[in-house]
UniProtKB/Swiss-Prot annotation:
Belongs to the universal ribosomal protein uS14 family. Zinc-binding uS14 subfamily. This is Small ribosomal subunit protein uS14. Part of the 30S ribosomal subunit. Binds 1 zinc ion per subunit. It comes from Methanococcus vannielii.
Length: 53
């Protein structure tokens, strides 16, 4: 019998991007987005976020 991998219940390893599945410290969870920063940069204009100088 093989053991199942340990699932993290809390911390950075438990947060995953809804779009690509990345884990780690670059997850944006504000407003329930749950996107990594790379996916957020691609989707931000479609979501209505504007970039100000």
């Amino acid at each position: 019998m093989t053991k199942e991998p340990f699932k993290t219940k809390y911390g950075q390893g438990s947060k995953v991007c809804k779009r690509c599945g990345r884990k780690g410290p670059g997850i944006i969870r504000k407003y329930g987005l749950d996107l990594c920063r790379q996916c957020f940069r691609e989707l931000a204009p479609k979501l209505g976020f504007k970039k100000y100088d």
